[in-house]
A protein has these predicted regions:
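Nucleotidyltransferase catalytic core that binds NTPs
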Residues: 1-165
Length: 165
């Protein structure tokens, strides 16, 4: 029995965690297309968070390892994985940037525990199947090209080379 001066105990509502958004990439020669992708990821995450009544988003970005860049792009990166990680981490849009696991993309995904994975327009469609077959439950969306045109670091480097000659 409560005395007249005591107040009833009200349980605190359970605070849900922010929505986890995940982006992966090389980010070698950071440019506006990268910024467009990260802004798109945050906006898509905020829209999903509102629908799910989650208190905002946390954007995690995994940076490709130097050996992965060499294997995929058949050239060494211009910036080291540490430099690329620091550049991306310095962006206000990004809550966390880390270098990916050696030879295991799925470990990097699991480390981030994403609710939403945003792929760039130029990332392989095979990643969606790889994620599904690994049992990743996150929703996967693809960012469109910036202003309907392809913007890639390799294109920028090519333009700079042509300007030098």
């Amino acid at each position: 029995m409560l005395n007249a001066g005591a107040s009833a105990v009200h349980p605190r509502p359970v605070q849900r965690p922010p929505l986890q958004v995940f982006v992966a990439g090389t980010f070698d020669g950071l440019h506006y297309g990268h910024l467009f992708l990260l802004r798109y990821a945050r906006r898509a995450g905020l829209a999903m968070a509102r629908r799910l009544r989650r208190p905002g988003v946390r954007l995690s970005v995994v940076i490709a390892r130097d050996d992965s860049v060499q294997r995929i792009k058949v050239r060494p990166p211009h910036h080291t994985q540490r430099e690329r990680q620091q550049l991306v981490a310095a962006l206000r849009l990004v809550d966390r940037a880390f270098v990916g696991q050696r030879d295991d993309f799925i470990k990097s995904v699991r480390r981030a525990q994403p609710d939403l994975i945003v792929l760039g327009y130029d990332q392989s469609a095979a990643w969606e199947e790889v994620l599904r077959s690994a049992g990743v439950q996150a929703r996967v969306v693809r960012c469109q090209e910036y202003r309907g045109r392809r913007l890639k670091s390799s294109m920028i480097r090519g333009d700079l080379e042509r300007m030098r000659t």
